[in-house]
């Protein structure tokens, strides 16, 4: 990349008056490949020098035709850039080499060859940084114009992403270069940020920069062909009159000064003029030759992104002044303010920014800033990534290191101009000025935050001197986010955000956008973006139609599959039914045949026996019966009893006796169905329909998310349900990146691709200042999605959760983020209020234990020794009471734990009655459950109670060393903990209970001096925290426990006479309070408290050996005496039961 350096404008000795020459120097950077470009004094002459002195040199040719005999051109020893042979020999350039006449005069006047379709045309577009133009018909092909990123012939990149000014274009200098404008100012029509080139009104000239000679040697300058007063031609730059003109010289060793060019035409006026008006100015500063050059912006050139005046050089720049295109944005693409000619009689001053140029004299001057790298030289530029001001040598060293090679720099002059333009008050500008020497992070913001530096409105004075009356910045700057032209500024945003066409489409809220610069350019950019969005809507509509057709097709397929599956199973059941019926028939027939055969045999034997018996009876009754006849009767009877007629010895096994006494079959025939209805349950759950999450039926779990703490990770739980209202079996698929693109057949534009959803579930959190907060999604079981974010400021945040682009139930909603509680301040200040004293009257307490705050903000206290429950307002004023001593419903015997559920019902552990009672919010008895015993559902001194969001009741069964869970109606659900003396007690006399936000149950293990956490999914697994002691995180007889609105765990460390605070996520110790205030803090013990209860001095009612209780860990600043329970009100107040002092402390 080259830097054009005008040094001076003066008369040349010995030359006639009129033509003047501009001495130029070029500061050249070495590319990454190691090929350094030669400057004056280089030893590489030979071919390069003969090439510049050839007869086809444009300089030589031009001077012979127009200037006649003039001074010989200087000697040049190389070109600034090298053109690859593949580019010279490309198919689109080969036909043009035959017109070897220089300046492109041999090419037809009004035609060029399209690089895509190879057709000749007169109007085209320069979409890339090479010379290969594209006709408008090829360029406007949709959507290919959005997909092209590099030239198909040479690989050059797009002009929109180049590190070069959009008003100046360097093409490869070919013997016959392409026609069309090689320059364009901000009024040039653009299409998708590409230069729209057309045939110029006057003869164009291709040009390149080539250098040689010693620094300061004269160089030929091509001027515009203008008639002089003598009627001849004179050579001078456009905008420089015949009178003496000069440039103020600047040296890095001198003080910063304001550079100016006298009598130069104003910038910013007459936008309707030809876009070629600046060409003559650059032509006058350029040396024309036919040396092939290559754009520094091509992919083969990896020069750094930095201002031209910061290009690497062996030493401090030798030139006396530098003209660097001022950059209008933080992006690395420099932009040049354009000058349009005005009347030659106009005498104006054009201030040119110098590298160390300060603000105008009206602004407060800034002293030299020391380099933050070497700390020995004056700073020259500011690294946007390192956030450091560096000198020129440190900048060069920055570019030699691979890790910092691609860092972007901004000159301090431009940086200060931008900061001053942002400053609303002089004090703020002074602060910015001071921050540059130290840390400008606060002034600049983080790199990549989307802020765009706009140097066009440095100050009102400078705008008046530069512009032509326009008060708004020029629209030639580029958006640092989308690399698109800035077209407007938001009037509603706090910092007047600069917007490109893409930013306007993505800008949140209905803000008013004021166009900048040429309104035609702004409208054109918005039209281009609108056309892209229109095309996107059309493609999305086509996709919706495809999805609708897919839904209908998939529904039909699912119906057919359901019918087929059920028919298959029904057929199988029918076949089984037929088989079982056949088996029944077979068994029935067999059994019946056997029994019928046996019955027939028995009937035959019976007849035979009957006849034999009758014959024998008659013979026996007759007196004249001879012996022979009787013998025959005997044989007949014996034959009938023996059965078979066979003579085998064992043939009479089945004799008549056995036939008569035993039945050959039974009636056993029974159908056995599947056990426990397994098949029936499976049939009822047969199959499943997967349709994904439905926004209408999905919702946020609970409402605690509406209040969160600043600078603390906050988690929101979302319950996903399908279209039928059923829980999703898994939420993993809904939070994973989708594999189906929104446009299946077209590759979208880059910013449209970023706007596409990557999963079914999307969550957006907008902070009070309008910025987006990063949200992390984590899938859980049963369709639960955990959304976590980190609020950094206080205020009202907006939450919107989308399922497939549709807000879920209850969204969008607001969340109140506030500053977290400081427990160190609570410990230092002590209690803000104390109420209650020893006694049995209304508002008086006797050894209270449990406490809770209901949904109405009332404070409910279990007055244990008075066998009642008292209700107070938030300030401790007595409201009502209920309960008396006894064992009937509504009566108590030393009530202990107390809590409320979501229905605002009051749940009380009636300790010595070994039961739990439930009351409504007015104290009316509802139900009771439990009795003394060891079986499930029975208690042995229940102590603490807790309820969750489902109103399940957890009870600490102290003497049974377990915790039992019940339904809201008192039905037993499960237990945890050992209740046998033969096992080690993992819970030893549990006391306090509370449910954590994630559903886990937190228990104070009284005799083990620790905390236990049980998971609701597996009650047999338990985590324990803490041990016995008086250090932080250690306990002695812990009792009550509660969760505050910020998620902190508060534990009553009873015998240490304090309350300890822990983080719920990792049980990290945060602080403690409850001791007396620091001396001289202004706090005094409340006077209404009586002396310690003398009759009961031991802990928890044990016989006393002295008149006053003696704590286990005495403290000189003791305030609490064995705190037993605590509760947190909706306003954040902490109510602590001071057991030993028979009162309630409020913090």
UniProtKB/Swiss-Prot annotation:
Zinc finger intervals, RING-type: 114-155
Alphabetically ordered keywords of this record: Coiled coil, Cytoplasm, Developmental protein, Metal-binding, Repeat, RNA-binding, Zinc, Zinc-finger
Any one of the GO CC terms: cytoplasm
Subcellular location: Cytoplasm; Cytoplasm, P-body
Coiled-coil boundaries: 565-618
Biased composition (Low complexity): 33-47, 84-93
Disrupted-gene phenotype: RNAi-mediated knockdown results in the precocious onset of tail tip retraction resulting in over-retracted and shortened adult male tails (also known as the Ore phenotype). RNAi-mediated knockdown results in increased expression of dmd-3.
GO BP, sorted A to Z: epidermal cell fate specification; gamete generation; mRNA catabolic process; negative regulation of gene expression; negative regulation of translation; nematode male tail tip morphogenesis; positive regulation of brood size; positive regulation of oocyte development
Residues binding Zn(2+), per UniProt: 371, 374, 394, 398
Record-level Gene Ontology MF annotations: miRNA binding; mRNA binding; RNA binding; translation repressor activity; ubiquitin-protein transferase activity; zinc ion binding
UniProt feature, compositional bias: Basic and acidic residues: 48-65
Filamin repeats, residue ranges: 723-817
ZnF B box-type span: 366-412
Induction / repression: Negatively regulated by the microRNA (miRNA) let-7 which causes degradation of the mRNA encoding this protein. This requires a let-7 complementary site (LCS) in the 3'-UTR of the mRNA encoding this protein.
Residue span of region Disordered: 1-93, 1104-1123
NHL repeat start-end pairs: 832-875, 879-922, 926-969, 974-1017, 1022-1065, 1107-1147
Top-level taxon: Eukaryota
Main location (coarse class): cytoplasm
Role: Heterochronic protein which acts downstream of let-7 in temporal patterning. Plays a role in the developmental timing of postembryonic hypodermal seam cell division and fusion events and adult alae production. Represses lin-29 during late larval stages, which prevents terminal differentiation of hypodermal seam cells and promotes their division. Involved in post-transcriptional gene regulation, uses two independent pathways. Has direct and specific RNA-binding activity and, depending on the location (5'UTR or 3'UTR) of the target site, triggers either mRNA decay or repression of translation.
Domain notes: The NHL domain, containing the 6 NHL repeats, is necessary and sufficient to target RNA but not to repress mRNA. The minimal region needed to execute repression consists of the coiled coil domain and the Filamin repeat. The RING-type domain is dispensable for mRNA repression.
Family statement drawn from the similarity comment of this UniProt entry: Belongs to the TRIM/RBCC family.
Protein's name according to its UniProt entry: Protein lin-41
Species whose genome carries this gene: Caenorhabditis elegans
Record lineage: Eukaryota, Metazoa, Ecdysozoa, Nematoda, Chromadorea
Gene this chain is encoded by: lin-41
């Amino acid at each position: 990349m080259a830097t054009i350096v005008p040094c001076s404008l003066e008369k040349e000795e010995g030359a006639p008056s009129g033509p003047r020459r501009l001495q130029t120097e070029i500061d050249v950077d070495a590319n990454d490949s190691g090929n350094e470009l030669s400057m004056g004094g280089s030893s590489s002459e030979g071919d390069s020098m003969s090439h510049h002195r050839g007869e086809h040199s444009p300089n030589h040719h031009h001077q012979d035709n127009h200037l006649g005999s003039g001074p010989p051109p200087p000697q040049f020893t190389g070109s600034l850039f090298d053109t690859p042979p593949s580019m010279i020999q490309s198919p689109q350039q080969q036909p043009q080499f035959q017109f070897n006449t220089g300046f492109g005069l041999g090419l037809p006047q009004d035609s060029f060859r399209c690089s895509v379709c190879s057709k000749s045309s007169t109007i085209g577009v320069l979409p890339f940084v090479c010379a290969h133009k594209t006709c408008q018909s090829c360029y406007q092909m949709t959507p290919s114009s959005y997909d092209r990123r590099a030239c198909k012939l040479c690989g050059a990149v797009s002009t929109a992403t180049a590190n070069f000014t959009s008003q100046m274009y360097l093409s490869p200098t070919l013997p016959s270069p392409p026609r069309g404008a090689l320059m364009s100012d901000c009024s040039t029509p653009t299409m998708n940020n590409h230069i729209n080139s057309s045939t110029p009104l006057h003869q164009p000239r291709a040009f390149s920069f080539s250098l040689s000679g010693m620094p300061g040697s004269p160089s030929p300058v091509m001027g515009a062909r203008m008639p002089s007063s003598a009627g001849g031609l004179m050579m001078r730059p456009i905008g420089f009159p015949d009178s003496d003109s000069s440039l103020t010289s600047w040296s890095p060793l001198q003080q910063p000064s304001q550079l100016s060019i006298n009598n130069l035409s104003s910038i910013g006026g007459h936008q309707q003029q030809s876009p070629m008006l600046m060409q003559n100015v650059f032509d006058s500063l350029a040396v024309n030759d036919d040396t092939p050059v290559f754009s520094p912006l091509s992919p083969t050139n990896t020069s750094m992104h930095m201002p031209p005046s910061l290009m690497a050089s062996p030493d401090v720049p030798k030139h006396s002044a530098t003209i660097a295109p001022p950059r209008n944005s933080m992006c690395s693409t420099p932009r040049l303010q354009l000058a349009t000619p005005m009347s030659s009689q106009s005498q104006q001053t054009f201030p040119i920014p110098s590298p160390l140029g300060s603000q105008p004299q009206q602004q407060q001057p800034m002293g030299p800033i020391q380099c933050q790298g070497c700390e020995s030289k004056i700073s020259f530029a500011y690294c946007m990534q390192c956030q450091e001001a560096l000198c020129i040598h440190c900048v060069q060293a920055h570019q030699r290191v691979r890790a910092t090679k691609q860092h972007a720099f901004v000159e301090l002059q431009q940086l200060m101009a931008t900061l001053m333009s942002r400053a609303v008050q002089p004090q703020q500008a002074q602060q910015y000025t001071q921050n540059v020497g130290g840390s400008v992070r606060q002034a600049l913001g983080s790199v990549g935050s989307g802020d765009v530096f706009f140097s066009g409105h440095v100050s009102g004075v400078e705008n008046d001197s530069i512009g032509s009356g326009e008060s708004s910045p020029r629209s030639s700057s580029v958006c640092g986010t989308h690399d698109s032209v800035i077209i407007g500024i938001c009037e509603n945003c706090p910092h007047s955000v600069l917007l490109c066409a893409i930013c306007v489409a993505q800008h949140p809220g209905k803000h008013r956008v004021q166009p900048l610069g040429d309104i035609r350019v702004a409208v054109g950019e918005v039209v281009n973006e609108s056309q892209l969005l229109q095309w996107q809507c059309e493609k999305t509509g086509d996709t919706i139609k495809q999805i609708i057709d897919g839904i209908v097709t998939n529904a039909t397929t699912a119906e057919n599959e359901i019918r087929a599956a059920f028919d298959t199973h029904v057929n199988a059941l029918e076949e089984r039914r037929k088989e079982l019926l056949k088996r029944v028939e077979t068994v029935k027939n067999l059994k019946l045949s056997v029994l019928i055969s046996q019955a027939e045999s028995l009937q035959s034997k019976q007849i035979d026996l009957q006849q034999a018996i009758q014959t024998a009876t008659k013979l026996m009754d007759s007196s004249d019966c001879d012996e022979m006849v009787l013998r025959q009767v005997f044989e007949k009877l014996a034959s009938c009893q023996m059965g078979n007629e066979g003579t085998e010895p064992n043939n009479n096994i089945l004799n008549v006796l056995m036939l008569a006494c035993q039945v050959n079959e039974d009636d056993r025939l029974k159908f056995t169905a599947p056990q426990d209805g397994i098949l029936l349950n499976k049939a009822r759950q047969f199959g499943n329909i997967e349709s994904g999450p439905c926004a209408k039926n999905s919702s946020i779990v609970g409402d605690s998310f509406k209040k969160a703490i600043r600078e603390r990770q906050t988690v929101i739980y979302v319950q996903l349900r399908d279209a039928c209202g059923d829980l999703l079996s898994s939420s993993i698929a809904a939070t994973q990146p989708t594999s189906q693109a929104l446009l299946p057949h077209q590759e979208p534009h880059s910013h449209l691709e970023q706007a596409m959803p990557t999963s079914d579930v999307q969550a957006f959190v907008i902070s009070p200042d309008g910025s987006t907060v990063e949200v992390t999604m984590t899938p859980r079981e049963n369709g639960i999605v955990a959304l976590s974010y980190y609020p950094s400021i206080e205020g009202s945040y907006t939450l919107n959760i989308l399922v497939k682009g549709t807000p879920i139930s209850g969204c969008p909603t607001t969340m109140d983020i506030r500053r977290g509680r400081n427990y160190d301040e609570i410990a230092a200040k002590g209690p803000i209020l104390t109420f209650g004293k020893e006694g049995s009257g209304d508002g008086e307490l006797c050894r209270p234990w449990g406490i809770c705050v209901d949904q109405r903000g009332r404070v409910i206290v279990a007055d244990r020794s008075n066998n009642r429950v008292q209700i107070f307002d938030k300030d401790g004023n007595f409201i009502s009471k209920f309960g008396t001593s006894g064992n009937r419903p509504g009566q108590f015997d030393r009530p202990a734990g107390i809590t409320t559920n979501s229905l605002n019902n009051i749940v009380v552990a009636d300790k010595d009655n070994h039961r739990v009672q439930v009351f409504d919010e007015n104290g009316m008895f509802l139900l009771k459950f439990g009795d003394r015993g060891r079986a499930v559902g029975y208690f042995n001194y229940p102590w603490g109670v807790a309820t969750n969001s489902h109103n399940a009741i957890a009870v600490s069964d102290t003497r049974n060393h377990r915790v039992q869970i019940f339904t809201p109606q008192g039905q037993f659900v499960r237990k945890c903990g050992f209740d046998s003396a033969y096992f080690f007690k993992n819970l030893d006399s549990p006391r306090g209970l509370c449910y954590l936000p994630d559903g886990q149950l937190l228990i104070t293990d009284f005799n083990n001096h620790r905390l236990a956490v049980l998971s609701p999914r597996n009650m047999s697994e338990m985590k324990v925290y803490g041990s016995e002691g008086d250090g932080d995180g250690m306990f002695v007889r812990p009792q009550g426990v509660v969760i505050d609105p910020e998620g902190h765990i508060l534990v009553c460390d009873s015998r240490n006479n304090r309350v300890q605070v822990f983080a719920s996520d990792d049980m990290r110790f945060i602080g403690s309070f409850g001791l007396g205030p620091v001396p001289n803090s202004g706090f005094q013990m409340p006077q209404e408290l009586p002396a310690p209860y003398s009759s009961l001095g031991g802990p928890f009612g044990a016989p006393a050996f002295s008149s006053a209780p003696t704590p286990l860990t005495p403290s000189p600043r003791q305030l609490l005496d064995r705190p037993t329970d605590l509760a947190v009100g909706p306003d954040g107040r902490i109510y602590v039961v001071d057991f030993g002092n028979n009162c309630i402390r409020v913090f």
